[in-house]
C-alpha cells in the first residue's frame, strides 16, 4: 500500500509538471519581453538550454514539453527504487566519458554497506528498446544481483530517454555499444570492483549491444547473457513496416538515411551474427518461440547455429511460447523464474561471487 500511495503521488507530480509546463509555455508564447522568455530554461545535464518559446514552431514546443516530462519521469523512477529497495541497495547516479568524450549518465548499485576493501564481481546491465531507460522492469533483477553479492552498473547509453534532447538521438549499434563499453571500463576502475570478474547482461536491443560489446572487446568480459537479442539488424529491417524502417534509417547517422538495400554494409556491421568468430566470453542465450519483435528463427535460432559452428562456449534455453513473448522477462511466470535462476547459476559459474 505504501508503494501504491508513493506511485500515485509520483503520477500526480508528473501530471502537475505537464500542466505547469503547458501553462508556462502558453504564457511565453504571448510574451514579447525577451527577458521573460530567457527565464524559461530546460535542463540538459549541466547545461541550461534556452529556447525561444515565442516561436511559432509548435514541434519545438512539444519537444521541450516531452523531454521535460521524460526527465521528471526518470526522477520518479529513481525515487521509487530507493523507496522500495533503499534499505538494502544503494543507488548512485554517475556520469562517465564515452570514447568520443561525451558524458553518459548511468546508475551504480551496491550493497547499502559494502565490505571495506572487498572487490565485488560486477555486472553491466543493458536495457533494450529504442528510447527506453532504467525503469521498474529492472528493479527485481538489480535487487537480486546485489543481494547475491554483485555490484551493478546500468548505463543510459545515447538514445535513452529522460536525459535531454541531445541524448535522445539513436545510433544503433554504434554509440550505444561505445557507451556500454565505456561504462564497463569506468566500472572496472572503481576500487570496489574486481575487473577480472566482469559480466554483461542485456535484453532485446540490449542483447544486441551485449553481443556487439563482447565482439568488439573480447577479453573484457568473463561472461555474457543475451536475452531475446536482435542478432541480425538486416533481418530486423526486413520485417518492420515502412514507417519504422525509414525512422531507423534517418535517426542513425551511420545509416546515412539509407535503407539496407542502399547501405547494406552499415547494417551488416551492427549485426552481431556477422562477428561471432570474435567472441571469447562464455555466453548464455535465452529466448522464446512466439517472439514477434525478434522472431526466433531470424535471430536467436540462427545465432545458436553460428555459435555452434564456430565452436564457441555457450549455454542456451529456448522456451515454448513463454507468456509475454518478447517481454517474457517482465512477468512473474515459470519461464521468467527459470530464466533468472539460469542467469545467476551461469554468472556464479564464471564470476564466483
Give each language-model segment a name:
Residues 9-20:
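Bacterial N-terminal signal peptides
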Residues 95, 157-353:
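Active-site-proximal cap/loop segments of hydrolase catalytic domains
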Residues 1-11:
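Bacterial N-terminal signal peptides that target proteins for export
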Residues 73-117:
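N-terminal cap/lid segment of alpha/beta-hydrolase-fold proteins
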Residues 117-128:
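Short beta-strand element of the alpha/beta-hydrolase
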Residues 136-155:
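Short amphipathic alpha-helix adjacent to the substrate-entry channel of hydrolases
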Residues 20-84:
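N-terminal targeting or regulatory segments adjacent to alpha/beta-hydrolase or S9 domains
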Residues 132-134:
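Conserved HGGG/HGGXW glycine-rich cap/lid loop of the alpha/beta-hydrolase fold
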